[in-house]
Amino acid sequence: MFKVKDLLLSPTTFEDPIFGTHLRYFQWYGYVASKDQNRPLLSLIRCTILTASIWLSCALMLARVFRGYENLNDGATSYATAVQYFAVSIAMFNAYVQRDKVISLLRVAHSDIQNLMHEADNREMELLVATQAYTRTITLLIWIPSVIAGLMAYSDCIYRSLFLPKSVFNVPAVRRGEEHPILLFQLFPFGELCDNFVVGYLGPWYALGLGITAIPLWHTFITCLMKYVNLKLQILNKRVEEMDITRLNSKLVIGRLTASELTFWQMQLFKEFVKEQLRIRKFVQELQYLICVPVMADFIIFSVLICFLFFALTVGVPSKMDYFFMFIYLFVMAGILWIYHWHATLIVECHDELSLAYFSCGWYNFEMPLQKMLVFMMMHAQRPMKMRALLVDLNLRTFIDIGRGAYSYFNLLRSSHLY
C-alpha cells in the first residue's frame, strides 16, 4: 500500500524542462501530487478511479467484440479500438502498481537536471535545450493524431445525434442495414440505446476522452525518461573527452599543480566518471524493469492489430470514417513501437561511444598509473548495455522485424481469403 507522503513531488519538479508538461497532466490525472497541494490524498484516489474506469471501459469493449459483427467492415474499427484500450489498460495498471518506482525515477532525474543547469557550460546547455525541444516534438507527433481522431469521433456523434437521429437512436433500422451506426455506439455491448443512454451513449464519450489523453501521455512520458538517459550519456562522453579537473574544484590552476597533485585530481575525476556511469546503468535497469511488461504486450498486440487492419483495408469496404480511423490507428501504433525501439537504440549507441571518449581524452599525457587505470575503465565501459522487454531486445532491428512479421501474416491472411 502506498503512503501519500512517498508519492509527493516538490513544486519545482512540475517546472522541469523535460518532464514538466507531462507531470502537470499526471497531476490532473491524480497519478502524482505536489507537496504544496491541498488534500493530495483525494488527488491520488482520483487516479485509482480513472484507472479502474479505463479497465471497465476496456472490458465492455472486449465484451462487444466477443459478441461478433455481421461483417468485417462494421467490426474492424471497433475491434482496433478495443485492442488499443486493452494495451493501454495494461500500461496504466503497470504504471499504477509501480507508481513508487516512477516517483523515484522522477526525483533522481529532476535532481540531476537541476545540478546540470547550475554547472553546465554552453555546449551542455545546448544539449539540454535540444533535448527539451525534441521531447516536445515527439509528444506533439503522438498527441496530435490521437486528439484529431477523438475530435472527429465527437464531431460525428454530435452531428448525427442532432441532424441524423435515426442513425443513432433507431437501433432496429441500424440492425437491418438501413442506417449506419456511429462508431461510439458500436463500442459497448448494449442493445436499445434509449434504454441505456447514460452508459451506452455518454459512457463511450467518457471512455474516448480517457483514451485520447492516457494513450499518448504515458508513452511520451517514457520517451522523456529515455531521452533523459541519452542526454546524460552525451554529457558524460563530452566530459570524458575534455578531462577537465576544474569541474571538481573551480579554484584549481592546472599550471601551478605539481605532477603528483595533477595525478591525484585526475584520479578523482576518473572515479567521478565511473560513479556517473554506474548511476546511469542503474537508472536504465530501473527504467527497463518499469516498461518491460507493457512494451512486451504492445509488441504482441500491435503486431497482430497492424496485420488485421491491413487485411481489413484490403478485403473489406470501409466507410470514409473507418478509413480515417484505421490510418490513425496504424500511425499511432507504429509511432508507439518506434519511439521505444528508436530511443533504446540511441541509448545503446551513445553508451558504446564512451570507450572511444576515454581513448580520445589525451591518455598519452597521463602518468603510468593513470594509463593503467584508464585501460580498466575502457574495459568497463565496453560492457554492453541493452534494453529488453522480457523476451525481445529494444532496437531498430526488432522494430523492422515487427513490420516484416505483420506484413507476412497479412499476405498469409489475404491469400487464404482469396482461395
Swiss-Prot record:
Residues 63-76, 159-196, 314-323, 411-419 are extracellular. GO terms for cellular component: dendrite membrane; plasma membrane. Keywords: Cell membrane, Membrane, Olfaction, Receptor, Sensory transduction, Transducer, Transmembrane, Transmembrane helix. GO terms for molecular function: ionotropic olfactory receptor activity; odorant binding; olfactory receptor activity. Interacts with Orco. Complexes exist early in the endomembrane system in olfactory sensory neurons (OSNs), coupling these complexes to the conserved ciliary trafficking pathway. The atypical heteromeric and topological design of the odorant receptors appears to be an insect-specific solution for odor recognition, making the OR/Orco complex an attractive target for the development of highly selective insect repellents to disrupt olfactory-mediated host-seeking behaviors of insect disease vectors. Odor-evoked OR currents are independent of known G-protein-coupled second messenger pathways. Belongs to the insect chemoreceptor superfamily. Heteromeric odorant receptor channel (TC 1.A.69) family. Or30a subfamily. Odorant receptor which mediates acceptance or avoidance behavior, depending on its substrates. The odorant receptor repertoire encodes a large collection of odor stimuli that vary widely in identity, intensity, and duration. May form a complex with Orco to form odorant-sensing units, providing sensitive and prolonged odorant signaling and calcium permeability. Specific receptor for geosmin, a microbial odorant that constitutes an ecologically relevant stimulus that alerts flies to the presence of harmful microbes and induces avoidance behavior. This is Odorant receptor 56a. It comes from Drosophila melanogaster.
